[in-house]
Amino acid sequence: MNISCYVITMEGESARQIYMKSQLDGLGIPFDFWQGNRGSRLEPQRLVEDEVVTESFFLDEQHGLSVKLAQAGCALSHQQLWQHYAQGSSAADMPLLILEDDACLDPDFCTRLNRLLPEVPVGTDVLYLGYVAESKDGEVVGPGLRRACYPRATTGYLIGPHGTERLLSRLFPLSMPIDEDMAKLIWLSELSACIADPELIVASPDFQSTIWFPEG
């Protein structure tokens, strides 16, 4: 597969890193770890000033500050990786595979992905390989491939050529968690996306969420 792969992880998450390395080495996929941001170490005002999130992002009566900071840390991790990749020489022609460090890949991941890639419509910004709460009502565009409607989760996805530029220019500052704002852009036809159906990636049940159970 002619793709570039990064795994977003955080300092001290050795069990997750061993888990991801075992999977990807077993599948023969070269990858790099990307140092993510732990929300507890971020400052709300700085996130607003840097236009990562809006002030309204933190006006959430359902969730406390620790959860909102964890969501912001997740968003910042993805944003910084997109920025890094967009500045590189391969961003114009090589898809970018981004995995979070609890991604559980299908045993036939490489075979299935190699079948999907030629079917992805030209101009697609994001291919969701894992997702939640998706209706799967989108148009079938190829074997195992549908147009996305309103997918959530950033556990595992591919960004197509120029997709990082569109995400960076249209998504920030966020008013909601990053997966919600991405889904909103897709729903409004401001971002072109497809989903793998069925999924190639799910979140591993062996690790608890670092969003809903953030650590210091």
Give the residues covered by each predicted segment:
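An acidic/histidine-cluster motif and surrounding catalytic segment
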Residues: M1-L99, A103-G216
